[in-house]
Regions:
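An active-site-proximal "capping" alpha-helix that borders the catalytic cofactor pocket
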Residues: 46, 181, 389-406
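Extended, compositionally biased alpha-helical segments that mediate assembly or anchoring
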Residues: 485-532
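N-terminal helix-rich structural modules
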Residues: 22-187
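C-terminal motif of bacterial Sec signal peptides marking the signal peptidase cleavage site
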Residues: 14-16
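Contiguous, non-catalytic segments that form substrate-binding/exosite surfaces or channel walls
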Residues: 157-347, 351
Length: 532
């Protein structure tokens, strides 16, 4: 985004509203705290590395345009809006639908957001889909279109977005020619091949082999959260990251503990036979650029990739903790929420360090657990269908907290207490719930909140403040984790659907809490001004 956009937001914040609609939109725009993105790690780069990062940014801006096409269509429609608040909020949301309000439309003339965005024909019926026998129709890297006779057909991303992808390939090829890091050069070369073939395995493996580079580039069609119809299509995005060598070194020892942590999971032995790869990375970065899917609505503060289970088995995963983004969210959102909700006596347990550890092991938890069902239903993802991402996020939430608590008991994490980890986690649930239920993350957090409340992990005192029962919270961690893993291991999608339908909702007490938070003017999320 251009800096002028953020200047416009500042002007809008001071402008008088002409009507109630403008007032509501003004509040929506201001619900995102503007964060200037910069890093001392960027200042320390060589001139050659700065050239490479500039090329990465150009490639990322193309990813941004491609995501607009995927999630909405023609960005020019939103750029042409005459209401400045509508336009500003549309730029944040990549369209006229509010990410933090279950994708409710906020621009007149637009109805509900299509579940399949632009990945499928808007007029496609389920009867057509079920009769459509193309083996590639559920590929991450195809769109579904109509042929000249009106019949459904698949089109590979490399064909649908060929013009833009060739520009990206040229930029990555130039970057590869400039880098002095062999691992980065190999990764970029393989990523170019991936964009041209829609086969990302080799580039994902090369990315995992890239261990000693001071920067990282996450680019391509990656997550499938944007496809609410089948969760089958990958959305384009880009992160440009600079490695924090000191903080990363402090995390290195935990990679070797992953197999041990897997055996410690609070579930039946037959559900934890998967052995995670030990080539996994666990590193800390400053994020200096977001584009596309990751930049829409609520912002990612940690990454766990690749998603390909073949890579998990062979190489593990890379967990990237985005420290500057994480601290921005803690300072502007988490800490103020804790002051509003948690009893004063327990506010001392809300710490930035605990937030860091909880988020870090949320990402680690994605790589653990069960990958194949135990009853012949195939992979967990296949068996869980439309529930897969909600339950995967729920698993990562609670297993992350389980692992932090376990590592504290083992003496491996020494700078926080279990009380800090648990209290910060519980307050953090509300931060995430405010993302709305348009996201799998929001649904997962709501299920966790309701489970912990019903089982006594916390209650409200006479003043309406939260009082955490740390003993009961510890019991909830184990029992909730066990329920999730068992559901995934057995591929019990019918139970998963029924459970999420009943429990991914906001009750009266939490609704009142959220009103308190909103009344205090606490931002719901952040929006970036890339100041470099």
């Amino acid at each position: 985004m251009k800096r002028i956009f953020f200047m416009a937001i500042a002007v809008l914040a001071l402008a008088a509203c002409s009507n109630n609609t403008d007032e509501v939109l003004k509040e929506k725009v201001e619900s995102y705290a503007v964060v200037e993105v910069k890093s001392p790690l960027y200042d320390a780069l060589s001139e050659n590395d700065k050239k490479i990062v500039s090329l990465f940014r150009q490639a990322g801006e193309i990813m941004d345009g491609l995501f607009w096409k995927q999630t909405f269509g023609d960005k020019a429609e939103m750029e042409a809006l005459t209401n400045e608040y509508e336009k500003a909020y549309a730029m944040i949301n990549y369209g006229p639908w509010d990410h933090l309000d279950n994708n409710a439309p906020f621009v007149e003339g637009y109805g509900e957001k299509p579940l399949g965005c632009q990945y499928y024909p808007q007029d496609m019926t389920m009867e057509e889909w079920n009769a459509f026998e193309d083996p590639n129709k559920l590929s991450l890297y195809t769109v579904v279109r109509r042929d000249e006779n009106g019949a459904l057909k698949t089109v590979w991303y490399r064909e649908e977005y060929k013009e833009e992808l060739e520009k990206v390939c040229a930029l990555l090829e130039e970057s590869a020619s400039l880098t002095e890091n062999e691992g980065m050069r190999t990764y970029l070369t393989e990523r170019v091949k991936a964009f041209r073939t829609d086969d990302y395995l080799a580039s994902d493996l090369a990315w995992m082999d890239m261990k000693d580079c001071n920067m990282d580039l996450v680019i391509g069609p990656i997550e499938n959260y944007d496809d609410h119809l089948f969760e089958a299509k990958a959305a384009y995005e880009c992160f440009i990251l600079l490695k924090d060598e000191k903080r990363s070194a402090n995390l290195a020892k935990y990679v070797g503990l992953l197999p041990t942590l897997q055996t410690m999971l609070p579930c039946a032995p037959e559900y934890k036979t998967f052995v995670p790869g030990t080539s996994s990375d666990l590193n800390v970065y400053d994020a200096i650029f977001y584009a596309g899917d990751c930049n829409g609505g609520s912002k990612t503060i940690a990454i766990n990739l690749p998603n390909d289970e073949r890579v998990h088995a062979a190489k593990g995963t890379r967990r990237l903790q985005l420290y500057n983004s994480m601290m921005a969210k803690f300072d502007k959102i988490m800490a103020p929420i804790g002051e509003v909700l948690v009893t004063p006596e327990q506010q001392k347990y809300l710490t930035a360090d605990a937030f860091f550890w909880n988020v870090t092991f949320h990402e680690v938890a994605h790589g653990l657990g069960v990958k194949q069902t135990v009853n012949g239903k195939g992979t967990v993802d296949e068996a869980m269908g439309s529930e897969k991402t909600t339950w995967e996020e729920a698993k990562a939430d609670i297993l992350g907290l389980f692992m932090v608590s376990s590592l504290i008991d083992m003496g491996e994490i020494t700078d926080i207490t279990k009380e800090e980890s648990i209290a910060t986690f519980i307050a953090g649930i509300v931060r995430s719930v405010r993302f709305g239920f348009a996201s799998s993350h929001g649904k997962a957090n709501m299920m966790c909140y309701n489970y912990m409340e019903k089982n006594g992990a916390f209650s409200r005192n006479e003043e309406g403040k939260w009082v955490i029962d740390f003993e009961k919270a510890a019991e909830c961690i184990n029992s909730w984790a066990n329920l999730i893993i068992e559901t995934q291991a057995t591929g019990n999608v019918e139970f998963a659907k029924a459970y999420s339908a009943e429990n991914a909702s906001i009750g009266e007490a939490l609704a009142a809490d959220i009103e308190k938070i909103n009344g205090a003017g606490i931002p719901r999320d952040i929006v970036f001004d890339f100041a470099w």
